[in-house]
């Protein structure tokens, strides 16, 4: 091909006069963007040579003098006399606007840098440019300034290589900035290397001593994979189609984010404003996914109207087309205008992806579900925006009806209690200090937002009320400066249900109002679960553990256990109380708890085979007055039907029991009991009961089933009075770790949660003893 690339291939269209007068028309601007565009134009010429199969290495060098050198190992710009211009072709290419091989279809099937246009514009806007060509065994050289020849064209040496080297100095009379930016250039060269996997681009910046080499054999498939920083829903999908002299290459994948990252290129030129190639891809993709939803989604899911934005949520894609004569909107090629490209790309995308979906149903379903989720999220976001666009007036009319607002309008001194239940809300409203304390009752458990999509979340009345009351919006409309209360206090019953509601609310805040947590606005109230009364003594106790510890401390007074100090006994019985609590939990899950306790306290028995273990268990049951009616033994388990005071129970002893987190925790706690080496003449649980019974003599213990059982005065003095209350501030030290924790414990996946509990049960060391 080399001998066919000569002077006759360079077509001349018109002169160069206007470039210096209106540089913006040719390079976009005279700022940092236009400056780098100069380098791109020269590099694009080398890329054209590579696309035509004549070049595989491009070297770009920024010098300490402020110039840029671009070299390639292509065929070299023709140097023979031009047939119509009566001057060397190299001179024509560099001094005549619209003179280039691009305009001769036989030279380049496709071309990115408008060959000749780009180089001549660069020449016109440079205070100096030196062109060196290796061709025909010779080295040719010519110098220019401001687009004009300043040295004779001539041979300066011999060479067996071929290629072109352009060195230019941007004109500081034209450009506002003449300092090249390494990172901007490296990003562009990296893109070019992805788009042209056979090319190596070596980039060196002598000003800072940096050097990088870009070469990606995986091409644009590797590009989308490298762009993805999240969990991928699909592997990279790639296709390449040639039709009507147009080459279409597309690579895409989906991840679990909510944004789209679509990059498009025409003849290696990035088209930041898109164009007909992007439109064609989007059209084809939307059709494929819409068709797949129509054929495979449930009837209820089909009701969701899918838009193009929905199918591109979580999409990372590269669309690269090679077009013989592209029409760009604007000289800087920001947008492709060639209308015939759209149907070609649309057809190619539709046909390939339709086939791909048929052959890869798992990934197709993942993409379908992602689009359906996006559609629901879009509707929800619309609803959320409408909610937050309500009047910002603080008059009661714009706030939730159940909200009892405070009198203060100063957020820094205002606090809002999110209270579990209407009845508790009533007590809180009466007991509060209304000058700075607002009350918002929440009915029942709010939604687990980790398992629900945004549309469902925002249908929740409780969540709507919170968003409106806080005043700071949600999602994209969130504005922390509009928060109406700087303390948001979650106040729930002091039981398991209350803890669950706390967790649900914290999950919501972490996922959708994270800045409230990050800025220290979320707190947990600490209401008591028990009230202990004896004579004139009245003690509020936070939970079961606090009650048990208080009963132990009170009950050992007046009791005498010979040889045992009071503090030792107190610590010992606290461990026994923890052991009893675990045994109660085990009893809820496994039958014949007496046998399970016996094995925990005699762990050496478990080390034998099942026949030996069964023999020991049988003897133990007989001493307890229990009969074994039937049994079955193999190497994996023991099964026996035992007549106990509870009736007929099936006893199952196998690996599932021994590895259960509660069994392992009970064994760990009992080892701590044994380590204390205290001896009594009765069972340790009976000793604990004796102490508790002593503490309960003459006392009444009230358990608050809910906050609503407290009268307003009690609620104020235990939970709401700033001078005595205890609040826990919620903080997040490690956002990624917190994200993983919420996902693990509140998410849809059961297996990871189970695996975590089983894996960590043996590490339980958190007992406060």
Curated annotation (Swiss-Prot):
It is an enzyme of class 5 (isomerase). Its EC number is 5.6.2.2. Residues 414-528 form the Toprim domain. The record marks 445, 448 as: Interaction with DNA. Mg(2+) 1 binds at residues 420, 493. It catalyses: ATP-dependent breakage, passage and rejoining of double-stranded DNA. It is found in: Cytoplasm. Keywords: ATP-binding, Cytoplasm, DNA-binding, Isomerase, Magnesium, Metal-binding, Nucleotide-binding, Topoisomerase. GO terms for molecular function: ATP binding; DNA binding; DNA topoisomerase type II (double strand cut, ATP-hydrolyzing) activity; metal ion binding. Few gyrases are as efficient as E.coli at forming negative supercoils. Not all organisms have 2 type II topoisomerases; in organisms with a single type II topoisomerase this enzyme also has to decatenate newly replicated chromosomes. Belongs to the type II topoisomerase GyrB family. Heterotetramer, composed of two GyrA and two GyrB chains. In the heterotetramer, GyrA contains the active site tyrosine that forms a transient covalent intermediate with DNA, while GyrB binds cofactors and catalyzes ATP hydrolysis. A type II topoisomerase that negatively supercoils closed circular double-stranded (ds) DNA in an ATP-dependent manner to modulate DNA topology and maintain chromosomes in an underwound state. Negative supercoiling favors strand separation, and DNA replication, transcription, recombination and repair, all of which involve strand separation. Also able to catalyze the interconversion of other topological isomers of dsDNA rings, including catenanes and knotted rings. Type II topoisomerases break and join 2 DNA strands simultaneously in an ATP-dependent manner. This is DNA gyrase subunit B. It comes from Campylobacter jejuni subsp. jejuni serotype O:2 (strain ATCC 700819 / NCTC 11168).
């Amino acid at each position: 091909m080399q001998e066919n690339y000569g002077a006759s291939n360079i077509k001349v269209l018109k002169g160069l006069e206007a470039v210096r007068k209106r540089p913006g028309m040719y390079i976009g601007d005279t700022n940092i963007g236009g400056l780098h565009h100069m380098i791109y134009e020269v590099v694009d010429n080398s890329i054209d040579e590579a696309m035509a199969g004549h070049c595989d290495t491009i070297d770009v060098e920024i010098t300490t003098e402020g110039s840029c050198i671009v070299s390639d190992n292509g065929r070299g710009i023709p140097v023979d006399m031009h047939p119509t211009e009566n001057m060397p072709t190299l001179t024509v290419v560099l001094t005549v606007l619209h003179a280039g091989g691009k305009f001769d279809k036989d030279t380049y099937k496709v071309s990115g840098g408008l060959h000749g246009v780009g180089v001549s514009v660069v020449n016109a806007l440079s205070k100096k440019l030196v062109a060196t060509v290796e061709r025909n065994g010779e080295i040719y050289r010519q110098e220019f300034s401001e687009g004009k020849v300043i040295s004779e064209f001539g041979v300066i040496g011999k060479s067996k290589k071929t290629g072109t080297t352009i060195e230019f100095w941007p004109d500081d009379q034209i450009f506002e900035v003449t300092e090249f930016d390494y990172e901007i250039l490296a990003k562009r060269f990296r893109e070019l290397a992805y788009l042209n996997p056979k090319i190596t681009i070596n980039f060196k910046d002598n000003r800072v001593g940096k050097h990088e080499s870009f070469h990606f054999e995986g091409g644009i498939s590797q590009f989308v994979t490298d762009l993805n920083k999240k969990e991928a829903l699909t592997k990279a999908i790639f296709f390449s189609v040639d039709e009507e002299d147009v080459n279409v290459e597309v690579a895409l994948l989906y991840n679990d984010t909510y944004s789209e990252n679509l990059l498009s290129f025409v003849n290696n030129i990035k088209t930041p404003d898109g164009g007909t190639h992007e439109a064609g891809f989007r059209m084809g993709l939307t059709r494929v996914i819409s068709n797949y939803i129509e054929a495979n989604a449930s009837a209820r899911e089909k009701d969701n109207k899918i838009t193009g934005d929905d199918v591109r949520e979580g999409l990372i894609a590269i669309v690269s087309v090679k077009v013989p004569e592209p029409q760009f909107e604007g000289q800087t090629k920001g947008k492709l205008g060639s209308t015939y490209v759209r149907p070609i790309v649309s057809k190619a995308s539709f046909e390939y992806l339709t086939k791909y979906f048929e052959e890869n149903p798992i990934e197709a379903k993942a993409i379908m579900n992602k689009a359906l989720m996006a559609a629901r999220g879009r509707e929800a976001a619309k609803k959320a925006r409408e909610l937050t666009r309500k009047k910002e007036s603080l008059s009661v009319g714009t706030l939730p009806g159940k909200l009892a607002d405070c009198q203060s309008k100063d957020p820094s001194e205002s606090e809002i209690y999110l209270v579990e239940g209407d009845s508790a809300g009533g007590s809180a409203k009466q007991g509060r200090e209304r000058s700075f304390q607002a009350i918002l009752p929440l009915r029942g458990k709010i939604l687990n937002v980790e398992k629900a999509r945004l549309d469902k979340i925002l249908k929740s009345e409780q969540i709507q009320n919170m968003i409106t009351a806080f005043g700071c919006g949600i999602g994209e409309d969130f504005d922390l400066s509009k928060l109406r209360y700087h303390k948001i206090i979650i106040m729930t019953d002091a039981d398991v249900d209350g803890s669950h509601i706390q967790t649900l609310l914290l999950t919501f805040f972490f996922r959708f109002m994270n800045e409230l947590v990050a800025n220290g606005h979320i707190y947990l109230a600490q209401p008591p679960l028990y009230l202990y009364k004896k004579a004139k003594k009245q003690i509020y106790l936070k939970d079961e553990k606090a009650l048990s510890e208080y009963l132990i401390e009170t009950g050992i007074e007046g009791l005498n256990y010979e040889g045992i100090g009071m503090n030792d006994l107190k610590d010992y019985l606290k461990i026994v109380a923890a052991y009893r609590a675990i045994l109660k939990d085990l009893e809820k899950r496994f039958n014949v708890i007496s046998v399970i306790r016996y094995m925990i306290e005699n762990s050496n028995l478990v080390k034998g085979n099942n026949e030996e273990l069964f023999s020991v268990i049988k003897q133990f049951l007989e001493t307890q007055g229990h009969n074994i009616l039937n049994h079955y033994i193999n190497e994996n388990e023991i099964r026996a039907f035992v007549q106990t005071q509870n009736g007929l129970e099936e006893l199952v002893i196998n690996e599932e029991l021994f590895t259960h987190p509660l069994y392992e925790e009970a064994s760990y706690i009992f080892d701590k009991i044994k380590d204390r080496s205290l001896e009594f003449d009765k069972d340790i649980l009976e000793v604990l009961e004796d102490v508790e019974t002593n503490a309960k003599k003459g006392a009444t213990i009230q358990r608050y089933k809910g906050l609503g059982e407290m009268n307003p005065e009690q609620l104020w003095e235990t939970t709401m009075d700033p001078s005595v209350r205890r609040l826990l501030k919620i903080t997040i030290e490690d956002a990624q770790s917190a994200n993983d924790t919420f996902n693990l414990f509140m998410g849809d996946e059961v297996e990871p949660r189970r695996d975590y509990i089983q894996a960590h049960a043996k590490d339980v060391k958190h007992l406060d003893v």
